[in-house]
């Protein structure tokens, strides 16, 4: 728990849960209905996200073995944030805009999991990856719970979901910056050369 990398991973995964299961999984259908989109149509778009999610997560797993996982997460959270910022306008444009959102957001939905698991293993070792990712995964569920309740409370207070979706988009952009700091040691310069080599090994 003293590890900065743990809190960066847990914090970014908290935002992942907040912006997916808690927000979109819970509130997309009611938000769509408020914009005149039938419930069955909105549910169908949410189901279509699951199909694109399968594709996106599979490709993400392949990429996580070949690319810098921090940069992958930066792209994923950045694109998710931009998608959420676009969502209020997609809802206003009715079906076509929401369909475009479903494609891009669906591809990104669980794409964050493979690089997060890989970074957890690289940071804490394969012997500890199970328990460490368990705690990081718990933060994901906590984020989902916060968003499920918080988005509903904001909707009841403000009368619509626009502020909620825009705020979640901005939070995802913050996460895109945070994940780039995973694995960076601020104390490297203060360590003697021999000690630094032992830490890096």
What is each stretch, according to the model?
Residues 111-124:
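Intracellular juxtamembrane helix-capping segments at the cytosolic ends
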Residues 4-60, 147:
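Extracytoplasmic gate region of multi-pass secondary transporters
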Residues 14, 97-111:
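Hydrophobic core of transmembrane alpha-helices in multi-pass small-molecule transporters
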Residues 79-92:
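C-terminal ends and interior cores of transmembrane alpha-helices
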Residues 169-201:
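Multi-pass alpha-helical transporter architecture, strongest
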Residues 123-158:
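A late C-terminal transmembrane helix in Major Facilitator Superfamily
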Residues 66-77:
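Cytoplasmic membrane-interface "Motif A"-like loop-to-helix N-cap segments
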Residues 32-33, 63-64, 151-159:
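Interfacial helix-cap and linker-helix signal at transmembrane-aqueous boundaries
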């Amino acid at each position: 728990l003293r590890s900065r990398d743990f809190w960066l991973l847990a914090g970014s995964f908290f935002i992942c849960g907040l912006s997916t299961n808690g927000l979109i999984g819970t509130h997309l259908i009611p938000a769509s209905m408020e914009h005149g989109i039938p419930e069955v149509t909105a549910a169908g778009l949410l189901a279509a996200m699951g199909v694109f999610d399968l594709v996106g997560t599979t490709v993400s797993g392949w990429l996580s073995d070949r690319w810098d996982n921090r940069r992958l997460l930066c792209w994923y959270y950045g694109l998710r944030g931009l998608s959420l910022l676009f969502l209020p306008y997609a809802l206003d444009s009715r079906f076509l805009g929401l369909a475009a959102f479903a494609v891009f957001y669906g591809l990104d939905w669980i794409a964050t999991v493979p690089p997060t698991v890989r970074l957890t293993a690289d940071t804490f070792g394969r012997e500890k990856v199970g328990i460490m990712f368990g705690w990081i995964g718990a933060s994901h569920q906590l984020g989902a719970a916060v968003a499920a309740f918080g988005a509903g409370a904001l909707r009841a207070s403000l009368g619509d979901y626009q502020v909620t979706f825009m705020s979640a988009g901005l939070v995802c952009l913050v996460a895109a910056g945070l994940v780039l700091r995973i694995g960076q040691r601020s104390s490297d310069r203060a360590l003697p050369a021999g000690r630094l080599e032992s830490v890096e090994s």
